């Protein structure tokens, strides 16, 4: 993958993770057409998805897509699909839905991607329908190159609304004035209320140190200490020199 494309994919995934709460490992729903295409072109589907999303993935397939693969009797594609986790779609085995209808019913729940699926499909009509659902990353294979589609209009609009709500949350809230007047009920003042500033203390480095004033008791103690020190001092004794010569040339008697 080229560096420019990888950087673009990282930006898109950041939007999906911040706005729509996508988390690793990403759950990727694949359809029968993509499995057949990967099997025919010898494309490693799990590693391709991991390389495109730049994270760990959990590849999943619905029961209706498996039923569609059984009808093709392509053993290679069937064995490849059996390696993936089976996603229950709650559709009957006897009367399965088409893969496109099945995936759309699993992903689009009341107009939202509730389970945060990444859809990898070769069905153009299915991808067109899922672009109207906010927060659905779409992946397809083009000439043996796995491509993730740019952010859809619905996803970009939902992301913009979410960011604006985060930015202006609380500023336009009508209950803010009431909270400022009455408080929040617990005795605490509102967060937006300004804190009163008192007089500033002087710079401790520019203030002169106070002179220590000795009390009479301290002076008496100092005098006692000095007198004790004087008493403890010893007087050095000088030894007399017995070998001092006398004027007549004899030494003094010891």
UniProtKB/Swiss-Prot annotation:
Any GO molecular function: small ribosomal subunit rRNA binding
Keywords attached to this entry: Mitochondrion, Nucleus, Phosphoprotein, Ribosome biogenesis, RNA-binding, rRNA processing
Residues covered by region (Disordered): 172-254
Intrachain disulfide bonds: none
GO BP terms in the entry: endonucleolytic cleavage in 5'-ETS of tricistronic rRNA transcript (SSU-rRNA, 5.8S rRNA, LSU-rRNA); endonucleolytic cleavage in ITS1 to separate SSU-rRNA from 5.8S rRNA and LSU-rRNA from tricistronic rRNA transcript (SSU-rRNA, 5.8S rRNA, LSU-rRNA); endonucleolytic cleavage to generate mature 5'-end of SSU-rRNA from (SSU-rRNA, 5.8S rRNA, LSU-rRNA); maturation of SSU-rRNA; maturation of SSU-rRNA from tricistronic rRNA transcript (SSU-rRNA, 5.8S rRNA, LSU-rRNA)
Alphabetical list of Pfam families matching this protein: Fcf1, UTP23_sensor
GO CC terms: mitochondrion; nucleolus; nucleoplasm; small-subunit processome
Keyword rRNA processing attributed: yes
InterPro entries hit by this protein: Fcf1/Utp23 (IPR006984), PIN-like_dom_sf (IPR029060)
Main location: mitochondrion
Ranges of compositional bias, category Basic residues: 229-240
Location in or out of the cell: Mitochondrion; Nucleus, Nucleolus
Miscellaneous note of the record: Present with 6960 molecules/cell in log phase SD medium.
Family from the record: Belongs to the UTP23/FCF1 family. UTP23 subfamily.
PANTHER family, alphabetized: RRNA-PROCESSING PROTEIN UTP23 HOMOLOG
Role noted for this protein: Involved in rRNA-processing and ribosome biogenesis.
Name the record gives this protein: rRNA-processing protein UTP23
Source organism: Saccharomyces cerevisiae (strain ATCC 204508 / S288c)
């Amino acid at each position: 993958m080229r560096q420019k494309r990888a950087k673009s994919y990282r930006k898109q995934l950041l939007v999906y993770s911040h706005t729509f709460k996508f988390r690793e490992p990403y759950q990727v729903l694949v359809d029968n057409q993509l499995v057949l295409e990967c099997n025919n072109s010898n494309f490693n589907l799990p590693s391709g998805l991991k390389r495109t999303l730049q994270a760990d993935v959990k590849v999943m397939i619905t029961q209706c897509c498996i039923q569609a693969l059984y009808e093709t009797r392509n053993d290679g594609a069937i064995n490849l699909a059996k390696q993936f986790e089976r996603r229950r779609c709650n559709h009957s085995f006897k009367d399965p839905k088409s893969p496109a209808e099945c995936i759309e019913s699993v992903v689009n729940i009341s107009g939202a991607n509730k389970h945060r699926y990444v859809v990898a499909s070769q069905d153009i009509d299915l991808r067109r329908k899922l672009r109207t659902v906010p927060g659905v990353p779409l992946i397809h294979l083009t000439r043996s190159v796995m491509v993730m589609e740019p952010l859809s209009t619905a996803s970009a609009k939902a992301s913009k609304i979410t960011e604006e709500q985060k930015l202006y949350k609380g500023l336009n809230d009508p209950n803010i004035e009431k909270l400022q007047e009455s408080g929040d009920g617990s005795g605490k003042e509102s967060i937006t209320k300004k804190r009163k500033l008192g007089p500033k203390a002087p710079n401790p480095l520019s203030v002169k140190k106070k002179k220590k004033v000795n009390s009479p008791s301290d002076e008496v103690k100092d005098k006692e200490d000095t007198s004790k020190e004087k008493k403890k001092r010893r007087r050095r004794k000088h030894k007399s020199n017995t070998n001092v010569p006398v004027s007549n040339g004899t030494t003094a008697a010891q």
